[in-house]
Amino acid sequence: MLYRKIEKYIVSHLQSGSDKILIVDGARQIGKSYIIREIGKKLFPNYIEVNMETDKLGDRTFADAKTVDDFYLALSTVAGDRMKEKNNTLVFIDEIQAYDHLLTLLKFLREDNKFTYIASGSLLGVTLKTTSSIPLGSIIIRHMYPLDFEEFLIANGIGQLVLDAIRKKFASRESMPEAIHNKLLDLFKKYLLVGGLPDAVNEFLATKNITTIRTIQNEIHHLYGVDAARYEEMHNRLKIQRIYSMVPSNLENKKKRVVVKDIEDKKGKRMSDYVEEFDYLISSGITLEVKAISKPSFPLIENSGKNLLKLYMNDVGILTGIFFGTNIKAVMDDVASINLGSVYETVVAQELKAHGFNLYYYDNKKTGEVDYLIDDMEHLSVLPLEIKSGKDYQVHSALDKFLQVKEYNIQQAFVLSNAQQVKVKDGITYLPIYYIMCIEPKQAEDEVLL
């Protein structure tokens, strides 16, 4: 069983006796059902699981379950005598978005207090935007993502002592010993190829076979494209599929942002003409959005009005599969003629999003672009990040100009690359790329008194 950080949260919630039902949201094939199933079977003597996607395609037993009694009746056809055990029973409603009326019903199931409930959803973000009667006070939504780099390290046998050492070195702005650096960088490059989809990671651990890993990734990539075709309106489906298919090629362009006129090859179109399509791709979890900001200040969410957008794949392994297929040299051997900038930016977007950051980039005609801006909670400022895949990692004219703007009040800046040495120069801290695992929102203290 792969270690997932969300496990601790799920266990804590189920044991807390909370009056809210937890829904784990995220893209398909990232391990939601598996982790809930494993936890549920460990914690509860009586475990009941129902998949609403399967039901919708089959008997449609829950299609008309609009009341608590109707739900119990439908559940009894699946659970049978297990419903007699009212105590120590967990009911897992998988793919709850298949029946949006069940989201409304959760409030009343919780109030009836017959069983403990947990749910998961794959296109839940989309459903929540279109369902008006969601009982927000009765549910907690927790987002889940593919394995991040630290989870990948743990899967590959990197122990807690090494993980603690990485965090300690990051905190003190020190370099890792060369031998450990080489090991971590090797695993990071393999992570670029494998990504964080559990099936791909398990295949890597079992066989190390890039061909079978790519087969898994290609199937999931195809599944995401099929999901895009589930949108109710046909004209929206085609545009959603087109935008999704454009993501890899957009990342190969210098600006990397979405070019609106390319979506339908029509002049005069604006970003606002495709709000529903972008919302679908982002809310479903299959793409990650990075919004443009031209005049940053803390908090960044107050400055995100600029109508420019970058989209990244939700898994870097899918991207390297599209770019390089089964050829691993492009990533593992630092081929000088191949620019891995979009690959490195994708893995950083994936990592930061999994850590809970909203993603922004700096775009200014005079100054240029800075890859990422995130909120620096510790200094109540903005933290710029530049991601470098090549050996010229100390060349970053846009970042230099950005730091010269005093009104931005930047307290620190990071450049992440393959280089081993950590150093600070002209207000910029140069870090090994694997230190991205340590860049997380500042955690609240256990007790903060006013």
Predicted regions and their residues:
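N-terminal pre-Walker A segment at the start of P-loop NTPase domains
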Residues: M1-Q15
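Interdomain motor-coupling "hinge/lid" segment immediately C-terminal to the ATP-binding subdomain
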Residues: T130-E252
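Structural recognition of the conserved hydrophobic beta-strand(s) that form the central parallel beta-sheet
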Residues: T116-S122, H143
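Hydrophobic positions on the alpha1 helix immediately C-terminal to the Walker A/P-loop
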Residues: I35, I39
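Accessory nucleic acid-recognition modules appended to NTPase machines
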Residues: N202-M377
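Short glycine-rich substrate-engagement loop in P-loop NTPases that contacts/grips substrate
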Residues: T54-K86
